[in-house]
């Protein structure tokens, strides 16, 4: 297909029509004029062969026929790195012949010789990891195989000196020298001299590289030894894995040289301290997946040793008494590096799965400690050594660092226990003062309605459900009003409210500073006994009366702080209080029952302070109990 301007868009139209020639480009169909073809083809062939072949310096990089082009599947065209011509001399090697040494296909067009395959260098050295699948030729050498040391030495030489003996590296070094000289003045005598210089440079470079490799592979023994960490003590050792709940306690132990474990583990460590020369503690902080170091136990547990303001986690057992330790090694050893170590003393589980003060089998503990010494020191090692030197200096000066007077921040364990007991007692007192129905927290929160029993005779109207619990107590949770037991002020100066937040709910819900102030013209007396309240016929719920004004400094709907159980029989007979009233016992019981039906909830919604202030409240409840029994 040709355009009007003579442009051809048939890219591979002349692939099979042109003559076969040893060019890298795709052959183009010759024009119709044979004379012009004879003139143009020969220079084109010579030019391509000269440029591609590099003027006789080597074969073209397109020296192998493209396998995909033979099957008509190559889509790269001129960009393909293989030859798109059928040339038997440049055919690729048959894969079956390369893998199995034979090819059973009669019409196979590929090569069946190993001459053009490059020799495998790894196989020449003695071992090829690719085996029979290697793309290079495996030529067996005569004689016995070389020793392993010689093979390793040759491999090291290849990896070390490959950069110095690389042809590209040599060409880069020689190219600037050749470019500096004129093209026509390159003498033939200079070539041996340059080659000799190159050989000398190549000999010097391997020596230098060998010296550098020896320095890197064989580190200085002085640098290899840890100057800061202390070696493991000689003798009989017992090893224990110690768990720390947090990193703060671990760093505090590094600074002060003490540790404290749970009281259940103290006997175990004391027994080990008395039985062997050295007790080695290998520490691991929880949730770090690392071992942080090891220390030697230097004192029994039981004597007073100052220091260690340990941080307790919520819900964990408290620590026991302090004991001194000497830090030997501080580092970061990953659990992954200890995955092959298992502890026979712990059901043969990995050492990373250990409880606090879990003893390790001596050989396993020694291996774990040796792994710690292979890791570099952490920053805490220098801190530990500095703190230890400071303690030694203070001992030399006669200063006792464990003195309580000189260390006011350090509190002994027994004093800690006493303070904690006092705090618990004070918290219990505050909770008892706060009252149960105010919720779990301290202070005036939202008050939950108590499950109070209804007064005697309280029944809902016919056809209605029972009264919900939310209306029988402080369910409004209105945050304002008079201050409570803790003296909370009235933020808006509202004073006591006559009703709840949404008006009166029941017949006895009128409680205000002035009776009837919300309903002018109504009598200030209470609702008649057994009359119609706001709930209709029958007895209304006795939630107090209109004349029952709230008391200052007390919440209006405060629930009772005591249980609703009746008082004991000791309060039933109170002759002193009955004499004060000047009436008989029967009259007192009748008055008490009548008063309690009207003031039952109002009296029950008072706390223990009101009971202690007013002497008339307790006898009413006790006598009301007798009245019920006599009825």
Swiss-Prot record:
Residues 216-231 have a biased composition (Polar residues). The modification Phosphoserine is found at residues 610, 612. SUPFAM superfamilies: CCCH zinc finger. Residues 412-432 have a biased composition (Acidic residues). A zinc finger (C3H1-type) spans 60-87, 88-112, 114-141. GO terms for cellular component: cytoplasm; mRNA cleavage and polyadenylation specificity factor complex; nucleus. Endonuclease activity is repressed by the N-terminal domain of FIPS5. Nuclease activity is inhibited by zinc (>100 uM), cadmium in a progressive manner (50 percent activity at 1 mM Cd(2+)), and high salt levels (e.g. KCl or NaCl >600 mM). Stimulated by ATP in the presence of Zn(2+), even at inhibitory zinc concentrations. Elevated temperatures prevent RNA-binding at 55 degrees Celsius, but endonuclease activity at 70 degrees Celsius. The sulfhydryl reagent dithiothreitol (DTT) inhibits both RNA-binding and nuclease activities. Pfam families: YTH. GO terms for molecular function: calmodulin binding; DNA binding; endonuclease activity; mRNA binding; RNA binding; RNA endonuclease activity; zinc ion binding. PANTHER family: 30-KDA CLEAVAGE AND POLYADENYLATION SPECIFICITY FACTOR 30 (PTHR12357:SF119), YTH YT521-B HOMOLOGY DOMAIN-CONTAINING (PTHR12357). Belongs to the CPSF4/YTH1 family. This is 30-kDa cleavage and polyadenylation specificity factor 30.
């Amino acid at each position: 297909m040709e355009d009007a301007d003579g442009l051809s868009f048939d890219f591979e139209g002349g692939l099979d029509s042109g003559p076969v020639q040893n060019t890298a480009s795709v052959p183009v169909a010759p024009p119709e004029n044979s004379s012009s073809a004879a003139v143009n083809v020969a220079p084109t062939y010579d030019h391509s062969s000269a440029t591609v072949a590099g003027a006789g310096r080597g074969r073209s990089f397109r020296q192998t026929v493209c396998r995909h082009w033979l099957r008509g599947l190559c889509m790269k065209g001129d960009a393909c790195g293989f030859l798109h011509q059928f040339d038997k001399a440049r055919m690729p090697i048959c894969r079956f012949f390369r893998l199995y040494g034979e090819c059973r296909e009669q019409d196979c067009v590929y090569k069946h010789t190993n001459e053009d395959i490059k020799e495998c260098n790894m196989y020449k050295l003695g071992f090829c990891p690719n085996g029979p699948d290697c793309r290079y030729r495996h030529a067996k050498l005569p004689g016995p195989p070389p020793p392993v040391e010689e093979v390793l030495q040759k491999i090291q030489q290849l990896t070390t000196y490959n950069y110095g003996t690389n042809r590209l590296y040599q060409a880069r070094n020689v190219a600037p020298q050749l470019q500096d000289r004129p093209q026509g003045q390159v003498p033939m005598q200079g070539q041996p001299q340059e080659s000799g210089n190159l050989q000398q440079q190549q000999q010097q470079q391997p020596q230098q590289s060998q010296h550098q490799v020896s320095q890197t592979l064989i580190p200085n023994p002085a640098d290899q030894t840890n100057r800061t960490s202390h070696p493991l003590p000689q003798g009989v050792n017992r090893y224990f894995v110690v768990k720390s709940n947090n990193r703060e306690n671990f760093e505090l132990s590094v600074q002060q040289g003490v540790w404290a474990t749970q009281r259940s583990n103290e006997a175990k460590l004391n027994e080990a301290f008395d039985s062997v020369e050295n007790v080695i503690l290998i520490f691991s902080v929880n949730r770090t997946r690392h071992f942080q170091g090891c220390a030697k136990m230097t004192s029994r547990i039981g004597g007073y040793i100052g220091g260690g303001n340990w941080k307790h986690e919520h819900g964990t057992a408290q620590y026991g008494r302090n004991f001194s330790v000497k830090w030997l090694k501080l580092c970061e050893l990953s659990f992954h590096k200890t995955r092959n170590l298992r502890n026979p003393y712990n059901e043969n589980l990995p050492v990373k799965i250990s409880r606090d003060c879990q003893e390790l089998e001596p050989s396993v503990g020694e291996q774990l400690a040796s792994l710690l010494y292979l890791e570099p020191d952490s920053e805490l090692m220098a801190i530990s050594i500095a703190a230890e030197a400071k303690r030694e200096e203070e001992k030399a000066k006669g200063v006792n660092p464990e003195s309580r007077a000189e260390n006011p921040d350090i509190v002994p364990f027994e004093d800690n226990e006493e303070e904690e007991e006092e705090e618990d007692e004070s918290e219990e007192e505050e909770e008892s003062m706060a009252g149960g129905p105010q919720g779990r927290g301290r202070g005036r929160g939202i008050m939950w309605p108590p499950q109070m029993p209804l007064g005697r005779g309280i029944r809902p109207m016919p056809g209605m459900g029972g009264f919900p619990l939310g209306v029988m107590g402080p369910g409004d949770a209105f945050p304002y009003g008079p201050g409570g037991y803790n003296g909370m002020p009235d933020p808006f100066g509202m004073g006591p409210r006559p009703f709840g937040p949404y008006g009166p709910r029941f017949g006895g819900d009128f409680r205000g500073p002035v009776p009837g102030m919300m309903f002018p013209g109504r009598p200030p007396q209470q609702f008649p006994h057994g009359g119609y309240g706001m709930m209709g016929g029958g007895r209304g719920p006795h939630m107090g009366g209109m004349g029952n004004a709230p008391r200052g400094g007390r919440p209006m709907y405060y629930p009772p702080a005591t249980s609703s159980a009746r008082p004991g029989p000791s309060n039933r007979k109170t002759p002193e209080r009955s004499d004060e009233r000047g009436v008989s016992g029967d009259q007192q019981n009748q008055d008490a029952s009548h008063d309690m039906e009207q003031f039952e909830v109002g009296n029950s919604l008072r706390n223990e302070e009101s009971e202690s202030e007013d002497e008339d409240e307790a006898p009413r409840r006790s006598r009301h109990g007798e009245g019920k029994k006599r009825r």
